[in-house]
Amino acid sequence: MAIITVTAQANEKNTRTVSTAKGDKKIISVPLFEKEKGSSVKVAYGSAFLPDFIQLGDTVTVSGRVQAKESGEYVNYNFVFPTVEKVFITNDNSSQSQAKQDLFGGSEPIEVNSEDLPF
């Protein structure tokens, strides 16, 4: 049993809304593998429910086992109990920035006698 992990950005093209007994829910359909250049193989897409906090434009990682289900002449692939996580991408292209402020309020060093120290 293989686990497939796919990262994609939720957008109008790959996300749809369906009505369920618990209200409207979003479903994302993501390619399960990349198509090789020049290949005539059709890419299979897997679908998963998105948590309510995922919005269009968010980048998500969907991971889980995929199950095939025949529906007439088509085969639908669905993630079974997937893990869906939002990927946090910073808009800052630079490396981690160091704190530029003085964390100690700009105070001068204090001289302490060694007799006053507890150790």
From Swiss-Prot:
Give this protein's Gene Ontology molecular function annotations: DNA binding
Q: Which InterPro entries match?
A: Lacto_phage_SSB_sf (IPR038621), Phage_SSB (IPR031900)
Q: Where is this region: Disordered?
A: 96-119
| Signal sequence, renumbered to the chain | none
Q: What is the lineage of its organism?
A: Viruses, Duplodnaviria, Heunggongvirae, Uroviricota, Caudoviricetes
Identify one Pfam family in the record. Answer: Phage_SSB
**Protein species of origin:** Lactococcus phage SK1 (Lactococcus lactis bacteriophage SK1)
Q: Which pairs are disulfide-linked?
A: none
Q: What is the recorded name of this protein? A: SSB protein
Please provide the record's keywords in A-Z order: DNA-binding, Early protein
Functionally, this protein is described as follows: Binds ssDNA with nanomolar affinity but no sequence specificity.
Question: Subunit comment for this entry?
Answer: Homodimer; two homodimers can further weakly assemble into a homotetramer.
The Swiss-Prot or TrEMBL record describes its family as follows: Belongs to the skunalikevirus SSB protein family.
Q: Does the keyword Ion transport apply?
A: no
